[in-house]
């Protein structure tokens, strides 16, 4: 909301500021990523030391997966925030709906759907961040395969870059009749 001049006073100020839009978008994204990743790290510490969940020798890979997931989440939020017109409530509703759909298609709500999607619509498995994140964890703990893990992480970072680029291009081209 704060990047669109017609939706908030802060957005109006930002759109006329002499600061390059890419700088503003990157600063916002880094701030959101820092908070998101810190929350996930706190959760991992809680799981490891309070709940005593043993992550084995894969902790570095788990942290990398969490970082890639946070980057994808922030990028996806930026994409939706830039392209969806409406209030914060509308954007939140769209984000929740899309996240639930991606989670369902990744097999996180009904396990057989993951296999069905991978057989009937294979490309969907490669562009669904929820599927890539869950498959990264599966590849570490079920398959024990690092090449598959790194493919998932690479795809997550590529999707994130595409979403950030699309957000920036849309934001850069937006013009307002009056601010």
What are these regions (language model features)?
Residues 57-179:
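Membrane-spanning alpha-helical segments of multipass transporters and channels
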